[in-house]
Amino acid sequence: MLLAIDIGNTHTVIGVYAGDSLRAMWRIATNRKAAADELRIVFSTLFSLEGLDLRQVRASAVASVVPQLTRAWMQAIEDATGTLSLVCNAETAAGLFDADYPNPREIGADRVADAVAARALYGAPVVVVDFGTATNIEVIDRDGRFRGGVIAPGVQTSANALFTHGAQLPDIALVAPPAVIGTNTVEAIQSGIMLGEADRVDGLVRRIFDQLGYSAKVIATGGLAAVVERYSSTIDEVNTELTLEGLRLIADRAYR
């Protein structure tokens, strides 16, 4: 089995693959202060609850945007499974990831994994919208090259900023209201955050198409992808496993 871990600023997603089949997936809060022993207990417990055996893990891959946690996760994985983790980046993804980009080393691991999976699953050109702490848009051109993209504050990040600085604004559920014109404070905030996010993505995607000179399939991933997709006119498909799938493909090639 392959253990794939996507360490984000807010959430960490853990996936277990048997061949190319995803056997289990968990989404947990990212704890920046967690030590290796704590992390080992976390995923050992998850494996046990799912009836999976850690001793069957033969390889592992990590995509991390939290540098201080990368080593802790790698140590936890090694202690629990005896495997040394492949760390995802533009170099370790070579052969699957071709970048027309001034400095490929600065491309985040999650963006690399998303681009690898999108190109493999959907062909080129393709655009990925990843809804996380940041909303990332990745552009793969018709030649299959990663061209760059957009990084913007994520839905929850924007909402937190609004609630923090607006003393009289209530904390709300991140769902769209029944209509764009809110008839109370909660609906008005939901309209601004959720419908505003969908329109922001649509506007940016159209600008990307204009710059490329052609359109592309648009794939959404991340925690709020399914919610935003309902109100977007440019998103074609939601694939919540995209980042993990990219890690699997990169690891499969590396361990071949």
Which sequence ranges carry the predicted segments?
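Conserved phosphate-binding catalytic cores of ATP/NTP-utilizing and phosphoryl-transfer enzymes
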Residues: 93-126, 248-256
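A short acidic, often aromatic-flanked loop/helix-cap motif at beta-alpha or helix-coil junctions
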Residues: 33-34, 92-96, 242-246
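Short glycine-rich, Thr/Ser-proximal phosphate-binding strand/loop in the N-terminal lobe
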Residues: 2-48, 55, 145-171, 175-176
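Phosphate/pyrophosphate-binding loops at sites that engage ATP/ADP/AMP, CoA/4′-phosphopantetheine
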Residues: 43-59, 205-215
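Short glycine-aspartate micro-motif
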Residues: 2-6, 61, 126-130, 219
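Short beta-strand-loop/turn "lid" adjacent to the catalytic site in phosphate-handling enzymes
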Residues: 50-107, 143-149, 154-155, 183-194, ...
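ATP-binding/phosphotransfer module of carbohydrate and carboxylate kinases, centering on a glycine-rich
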Residues: 2-4, 30, 158-256
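Short beta-strand scaffold segments in enzyme catalytic cores
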Residues: 12-16, 135-140
